[in-house]
């Protein structure tokens, strides 16, 4: 309901915008959004590896990284982890992970992260290994050090409010300058699967500020694209580099949204007669599945409508597999066999058409995006040199 209300507000504000400003490529705001989905993060990781490879080829630069091309990178749950991996700096102030490093990360650490260690009275996994590996990989790096703007969501169960970690919020809310490993664990701490995460930071006057956080999907329902667009809109309004962009002018936004796959277009369907016999537990499981599937579809529908209303449908690309079956639908099956299947899903997805009405494949669409991102980066660099 909250997502629907937010969209309607955005939609009518956009329709009210009468700007006829032509899109200037060098001033376009580029946005990458990555869904949550546990081990299914392997699917968008395959897409990211392909896109980064295309950028390296187009610019003839093997050191090109995604963070060099996107103004905002947002993610929730496993998407938040991917966001951190490609934006957190190493000792050379470059992303500590290339896109090609992400799938091997899942294969190495996934079986340990999703190794049953809980109890029937608590979360399925104790989260200790996940937190440990995040600390090892991300170190003491904080939000302000991210190489581009980030938008990572979580939900505070003590204040009952979403918490959005972004660089642009730090001036007003310095307590949000948390360590990246705390943020990554928090956004991945899905109820039932991992324990909530408690940590503290400090306010501008030095007072202790505490967080009690769970999975960002509770705040963004798995798909952070609307959140990422909101952060990008604020960035466009506040950064002089985007001076020609009018408020909420989606003609000058380029959005790539990556999903982690859904069940065969609502593969698990039910009749009213069946559901009438369910108890509370059965309903809880079904509602979670229905909510995740519906929210992914509706967010895509909302955003598509907005971009079409501004005659900018080519500025938005949603990459999603809607026909997952068997073990690939599970967010915590980190067996080697299932992870290999997820790699195949991602590689096959690249060859599929973007829509039933378009012959363009995802691979072709991503190549088109890579050229746009490359040209825009060059134009901006030339403008900055004057």
Swiss-Prot record:
One GO MF term attached to the UniProt entry: phospholipase activity
A Pfam short name: Patatin
Active site (catalytic residues): 77 (nucleophile), 215 (proton acceptor)
Glycosylation, residue list: 115
Comment field (misc): Patatin have a dual role as a somatic storage protein and as an enzyme involved in host resistance.
Domains as described in the record: The nitrogen atoms of the two glycine residues in the GGXR motif define the oxyanion hole, and stabilize the oxyanion that forms during the nucleophilic attack by the catalytic serine during substrate cleavage.
Family of this protein: Belongs to the patatin family.
Protein name, as recorded: Patatin-06
Provenance organism: Solanum tuberosum (Potato)
